[in-house]
Amino acid sequence: MRWPPWGSESQQADTPSPSTEQQAQQPPTAPAARPSRPNKDWNQSVNAFDWAAFTELRTIIPTAILTTAILGIVHIHRRYLRRFPDAVSIAPSYFRQRSILGQVTSVGDGDNFRLFHTPGGRLAGWGWLPWKKVPTSKKELRDKTVHVRLAGIDAPELAHFGRPAQPFAREAHQWLTAYLMTRRVRAYVHRQDQYQRVVASVYVRRALDFPPFRRRDVSYEMLRRGLATVYEAKAGAEFGGPGMERKYRRAEWWAKFRGLGLWKGFRRNKEWESPREFKTRMGLEDQTQGRENKS
């Protein structure tokens, strides 16, 4: 039967149909090429970004608050919470301006000791936070303490460097050890000396003193008990001001008048020496012995 009905048989016979072999011989159609990406200019990319969002108040205000908070934390840490491991590391801006707070770890002589700097004190967690404990062993404290020289006084010398002990040196050392050991003190630093110590006016609060917990000047307490003399060196004397020097000399005069401590019997004893005179005599003897050894 013809299909469509109006078509002739001759037309259908004249129209060839592609055979299977011809279809196999036809080359495959190539895939369509992808459209190339247009080259974007960097300036166009930057300009296309919406920078206006960074100028809105909802962005500026939180950014300013966060930046101010970070800078404030850094400033507070550098000014109030930075720990000084030794006297050399104390910033010069502290001298005659600020103080350091710490716990006394050892007393070397009648007028000097070592403290472990605890910036911020108990408010910063020292003494009650697990990671802010003051070390107790000598190994842990090595190179971690500030060597402090009491300002304005000179105590009798203990035996060291081959020199004998000065009279009343042991009593002064024992009193200072009992008065300061393991206690928290505040030291108003004045300067560094030639022995890598800081000369400081030191204050302590004690419950057993009367009135209790009143701030005590350690140098003044030693002078009024006759445990030290006013510092008499020609250079390097530090008192914390002319008013403190007058206060110290008045305390020394009263101790001398009452014959307390090292002033006991000093008027009748012709061989009595002050700590400064003792150091001067020992220095001259060392020089004489040195010349004799060379000759």
UniProtKB/Swiss-Prot annotation:
SMART domains for this protein: SNc
Cellular component aspect of the GO annotation: membrane; mitochondrion
Gene3D superfamilies named in the record: 2.40.50.90
Domain TNase-like: 98-265
Record protein name field: Probable endonuclease lcl3
Positions of the catalytic residues: R149, E157, R197
UniProt-listed PROSITE patterns: TNASE_3 (PS50830)
Gene Ontology molecular-function annotations: endonuclease activity; metal ion binding
Keyword line: Calcium, Endonuclease, Hydrolase, Membrane, Metal-binding, Mitochondrion, Nuclease, Transmembrane, Transmembrane helix
Localisation per UniProt entry: Mitochondrion; Membrane
Organism this protein belongs to: Aspergillus terreus (strain NIH 2624 / FGSC A1156)
Family, as annotated: Belongs to the LCL3 family.
Lineage: Eukaryota, Fungi, Dikarya, Ascomycota, Pezizomycotina
EC number in record: 3.1.-.-
Domain of life where this protein originates: Eukaryota
Compositionally biased spans, kind Low complexity: 15-36
InterPro entries cross-referenced by the UniProt entry: SNase_OB-fold_sf (IPR035437), Staphylococal_nuclease_OB-fold (IPR016071)
Pfam families documented for this protein: SNase (PF00565)
Ligand binding (Ca(2+)): D154
SUPFAM superfamilies listed in its UniProt record: Staphylococcal nuclease (SSF50199)
Membrane topology: Single-pass membrane protein
Membrane-crossing segments per the record: 60-76
Chain residue ranges for the region called Disordered: 1-41
